[in-house]
A protein has these predicted regions:
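Catalytic core and acceptor-binding pocket of nucleotide-sugar-dependent glycosyltransferases
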Residues: 154-244
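N-terminal anchoring/stem segment of glycosyltransferases
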Residues: 1-80, 84-95, 176, 215
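Short, surface-exposed amphipathic charged segments that create phosphate/polyanion-binding patches used
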Residues: 79-88, 139-145, 235-243
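GT-A fold catalytic core of metal-dependent nucleotide-sugar glycosyltransferases
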Residues: 82-140
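PAPS-dependent sulfotransferase catalytic domain
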Residues: 125-170, 204
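A short acidic, often aromatic-flanked loop/helix-cap motif at beta-alpha or helix-coil junctions
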Residues: 71-78, 133-135, 225-231
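A structural signal for short, well-ordered beta-strand segments and their strand-loop junctions
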Residues: 7, 45-48, 97-102, 125-128, ...
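Short catalytic/ligand-binding loop motif for oxyanion handling, primarily in non-cytosolic enzymes
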Residues: 14-16, 53-57, 106-110, 115-117, ...
């Protein structure tokens, strides 16, 4: 049985997090992620659409591999990655646990799969969070499209308004639970987010909705899963993932 850490690096389209179009063959954007996963002796897979064969060969090793994908521009990269993960995981066997993360602003601080909190909770979803509540100005704007598409979205926002804002830049769990969550997340995007023409991707909105309405009873977020978001706690080693 294996544990996996997956990430996706799609270039050639506007990156909403960096406010720019990323260079096609720039390994330095994923280098820290790859090195941190390899240092923990975990299997990491980087899905990409534009790395050269030369760079893939140069930076592949015992732990890190590259998988070329065809990007479908019908969905923003922040959303399309979930379809990539779903389709990849559906084809492989002997997977015990999975985390999926952002790739350019996340590094692994320690192996999450051997932590007592993880091993004792095979039916839990683990994810990042932010030091703010779900009810905030950015999320209200971010969720405009989903709010108009999903009948119960506004009620969910009201119910969980004062709860911590979850961050989909880091999430994972034991495989059966994780894959169930991932399939439901993809279904939400395919059903409600395919016609999104707003300036927001909907990835955070769909993730928080699903985690809170269907997985909230078995949800772990914050320490030790992640450092404080955007606190740039680069020296912390007591959490599983550093996220900015």
């Amino acid at each position: 049985m294996q544990h996996l850490v997956l990430a996706c690096h799609i270039t050639g389209v506007y990156d909403v997090n960096r406010n720019m179009t990323l260079a096609d063959d720039s390994y330095d954007l994923v280098q820290e992620w790859a090195e941190s996963v390899a240092a923990a002796k975990l299997k990491g897979v980087i899905f990409h659409n534009n790395f050269s064969d030369e760079n893939c060969a140069r930076y592949s090793n015992e732990y890190i591999s590259f998988e070329r994908i065809m990007y479908n521009p019908a969905f923003n990269p922040n959303v399309y990655r979930y379809f990539v993960y779903r389709d990849y995981l559906a084809k492989i066997t002997q997977v015990q646990g999975v985390f999926v993360t952002d790739v350019s602003d996340v590094t692994l601080a320690q192996n999450p799969f051997i932590h007592p909190l993880f091993t004792a909770n095979p039916d839990s979803l683990f994810c990042g969070d932010e030091p703010k509540t779900l009810h905030n100005e950015w999320m209200l704007a971010h969720a405009e499209h989903l709010r108009g598409q999903m009948e119960d979205y506004a009620a969910y926002e009201e119910r969980f308004a004062s709860e911590a804002l979850l961050n989909c830049g880091v999430f994972g769990g034991s495989f059966p639970l994780f894959f169930d969550f991932l399939q439901q997340l993809c279904a939400l995007h395919e059903t409600y987010n395919h016609s999104n023409k707003t300036a927001y991707t909907g990835d955070m909105g769909a993730f928080n909705y699903l985690a809170r309405t269907r997985f909230n009873a078995n949800l772990h977020h914050g320490a030790p899963v992640n450092t404080i978001f955007k606190a740039y706690e680069n020296d912390r080693t007591d959490c599983w993932f550093r996220h900015k």
